[in-house]
Amino acid sequence: MDSSPPKTITKALPRFSELKPPLSEDIIEALDRSGFEVCTPVQAETIPFLCSHKDVVVDAATGSGKTLAFLLPFIEIIRRSNSYPPKPHQVMGVIISPTRELSAQIHKVAEPFVSTLPNVNSVLLVGGREVEADMNTLEEEGANLLIGTPGRLSDMMKRMEFLDFRNLEILILDEADRLLDMGFQKQVNYIISRLPKQRRTGLFSATQTQAVADLAKAGLRNAMEVISGAESKSKTSSGLYCEYLKCEADQKSSQLVHLLIENKNKKLVVFFMTCACVDYWGLVLSKIPTLKSISFFSTHGKMDQKGRDTALASFTEASSGVLLCTDVAARGLDIPGIDYVVQYDPPQDPDVFIHRVGRTARMERQGRAIVFLMPKETDYVEFMRIRRVPLQERKCSENASDVIPIIRSLAIKDRAVLEKGLQAFVSFVRAYKEHHCSYIFSWKGLEIGKLAMGYGILSFPYISEVKQDRIGIVGFTPVQGITFEDIKYKNKSREKQRQQNLLARKDKLQQEKRGKRKKSSKEAVDDSNKASRKRKLTGRQRQTIQTAQDEEEMNLRL
């Protein structure tokens, strides 16, 4: 195996019909029907290499068209294979991606091209679905192309021994850095170990890490390196305009609402740090009067798969709206028409920044992205500039209305808002403490009091990390005159259940108190009796009793 550095080659941008070696007519026709005519840079460079039986390592900006860059040669290589058409359980290609959503999207994009291959069946294998259902599909319908996540793919490969990988032609690892970051190294290694070494391999990623480089050395042969946009000063797509907004923690929510109002007829994606934050802001934003005309959708890693799929499908079909999410949607998802990406919370991993903003300005289109930064976080701008992601400053809007009173009012009127706000705030604080860029996002420098105000918290909660590290809560003003136990759920069934729980808790406490009183009385009597017995067996009384017993024993002997 040649471990020398891959060669870097760039080419001009041809039409798909002009690529050498040529793509089949069926693929060209499928591209025409989908509206694809001219290659993007990454497609122009990658497709000829893979079709010429060369391995590739592709470093491409998110949104550069890399999905077609590996799907088209994937289909072409299988068409030209000596094993084509394959038997039902003869696997000829495998595509691995880190998330269920990305795998499902790749499978969907592949469908019109797979359909050009008679008697070839592609199967999607991801978590969140019944294992038995996947096993039945593989056994009854067969599988020639496998697309899925590492966990489910490796599991099926272990369970379904009748799957034949001996004639596999091509392996694709999409978002390779994320595959390794998410802890899939073991599963990826297992999958690779089951595949023949005489194959084509494509490794695609928007960021190149040492782990990716090590994987390339181990799994690829004489790989060609493709660096899309290598001459550009920016790591992001050319049509993307990136900004940052510096504002105090207690102003972030008001600035966000103002931004959403300005773009109410557009499609936006808003990223938050935690799942609890997505749940909270999804609930709150939809209740703010000035945002009533906007449709909100939410997705995060703790939602079940059906809920995530429904939210993404609804947002995709909508002409406008706002998708609130965590980094579960930061990679690979190609939702058409996204105009704006808002990073309400900067990502813990700086590499994720590129993938987040890559949800817009895809395939040479125009798009905007903005990241909210608190005053002590602005070193992040220089940090990203060094990483070839220039950010332009956007001033805080002076016309933004203060929404904190509105949010607090919502919490007073509905216990669900109150509880979700506390959960979101605490989850953010704990995630912030573990930030990967702690020298920029300093835990000790976090103005936690202002942050709590921005979340609309009514009374500052107990957080062990705050007390332990003696973090000040300057800038927080609690709401006075509120008895928190009296705040009710708007949902009547939830409130009824809460009242029942409160009564049950009070009854239990009263029973415990009565039990303690009875126990105390009994223990007092027992202690008195014990003390009395001890007093009878001490001092002169003990000696007198012993003497009497001795005399009685002597009389018996006599």
Curated annotation (Swiss-Prot):
Residues 506-558 are annotated as: Disordered. PROSITE patterns: DEAD_ATP_HELICASE, HELICASE_ATP_BIND_1, HELICASE_CTER, Q_MOTIF. The keyword DNA damage does not apply. Keywords: ATP-binding, Helicase, Hydrolase, Nucleotide-binding, RNA-binding. A motif (Q motif) lies at residues 16-44. Coiled coil: none annotated. Disulfide bonds: none annotated. Residues 47-226 form the Helicase ATP-binding domain. The Q motif is unique to and characteristic of the DEAD box family of RNA helicases and controls ATP binding and hydrolysis. This is DEAD-box ATP-dependent RNA helicase 49. It comes from Arabidopsis thaliana (Mouse-ear cress). The gene is RH49.
